[in-house]
Amino acid sequence: MNIKEIPIGNNPPEDVNVIIEVPVDSQPVKYEMDKKSGSLFVDRFISTSMVYPGNYGFIPHTLSEDSDPIDVLVCNTRPLIPGCVINVRPIGALIMEDDGGKDEKIIAVPTPKLTQQYIGIHDYTDLTENILKKIEHFFKHYKDLEAGKWAKIEGWRDKNFARELIQQAIERAKAIQ
């Protein structure tokens, strides 16, 4: 896969593409795509017996403050093949800090072109409380048994904040090209 050829999205930051690294409900393995080769590597085995609460990946051509492309959790129930690209709408952000510093997670849903199931979801507050709690619980605890690693939740932000994070990440990536 040539990541350089994958567009950011149809109308960033409102409509973006996400390259999936870890499918929803998969075994506790953290995969990470090598951004130069496009190859998927095993980053680590997650020590807690937890599964990702959504399909997890990143937006191409972005750069977060942690020097990686911006992370995205796609809220849907169907596991996607690692390496595939899905078009999504950002609906919020989970603001976190971990052993590596600031670590925001964009929360998104598939675009209406892919499925009508999320047509009524406009902001993270439209998700059920149970879904939000699962997402928080996962990201708060998935590093618990890894020596020297930790994660702390700072809070939720709305879709406008998420879009601003994405726009900043796009500009940051352009600045280093």
Curated annotation (Swiss-Prot):
Required cofactor(s): Mg(2+)
GO terms under cellular component: cytoplasm
Disulfide feature: none
BP term (GO), one: phosphate-containing compound metabolic process
Entry keyword annotation includes Metal-binding: yes
Cross-referenced InterPro entries: Pyrophosphatase (IPR008162), Pyrophosphatase_sf (IPR036649)
Gene3D superfamilies: Inorganic pyrophosphatase
Positions bound to Mg(2+) 1: 66, 71, 103
Keyword list, A-Z: Cytoplasm, Hydrolase, Magnesium, Metal-binding
Intracellular or extracellular location(s): Cytoplasm
Its EC number(s): 3.6.1.1
Reaction equations catalysed: diphosphate + H2O = 2 phosphate + H(+)
HAMAP family: Inorganic_PPase
Quaternary data: Homohexamer.
Known function: Catalyzes the hydrolysis of inorganic pyrophosphate (PPi) forming two phosphate ions.
Family, similarity comment: Belongs to the PPase family.
Protein known as: Inorganic pyrophosphatase
Species this protein is from: Bartonella bacilliformis (strain ATCC 35685 / KC583 / Herrer 020/F12,63)
Lineage, broadest ranks: Bacteria, Pseudomonadati, Pseudomonadota, Alphaproteobacteria, Hyphomicrobiales
